[in-house]
Amino acid sequence: MNEEVSRPTRVALEIRKTLMEILHRDTKDPRLEKVNITECKISKDLSIATVYFTIIGVNEKDQPAQDAIKALEKAKGFFRSEIGKRMNLRITPEVRFFYDTVAENASHIEELIFKALHQKK
């Protein structure tokens, strides 16, 4: 089956790819070295890109995560500018960063299940 992918989905995937390239090749801030973009969603009108990220080996409440969040917020304009230069879009979307807690939540649930299964009755 050959299903066509919607334009917002294609743009979101390309923004994710572009942001990963920028983070790993062009960003010199050491607070962003372990940042990994997990997902990008874009509004239907392509004006807002919601970017979810994690930090390898770090919990959201840890200091390195807080530092990375601040660095991403500070560099939002740079990321938007680079997306505009690298992608052929009529309007460069506003970039909004959010820490992705899915992996942490899954790990916590897995831990709870493990404890429940191995608890002595």
From Swiss-Prot:
Alphabetized InterPro entries for the sequence: KH_dom-like_a/b, RbfA, RbfA_dom_sf, Ribosome-bd_factorA_CS
Chain segments annotated as transmembrane: none
Assembly information from the UniProt record: Monomer. Binds 30S ribosomal subunits, but not 50S ribosomal subunits or 70S ribosomes.
Entry keyword Hydrolase: no
UniProt KW keywords: Cytoplasm, Ribosome biogenesis
Function noted in UniProt: One of several proteins that assist in the late maturation steps of the functional core of the 30S ribosomal subunit. Associates with free 30S ribosomal subunits (but not with 30S subunits that are part of 70S ribosomes or polysomes). Required for efficient processing of 16S rRNA. May interact with the 5'-terminal helix region of 16S rRNA.
Protein name (database record): Ribosome-binding factor A
Family listed: Belongs to the RbfA family.
GO cellular component: cytosol
Localisation: Cytoplasm
Molecular function in Gene Ontology: ribosomal small subunit binding
UniProt entry tagged with the keyword Cytoplasm: yes
Biological processes annotated in GO: maturation of SSU-rRNA
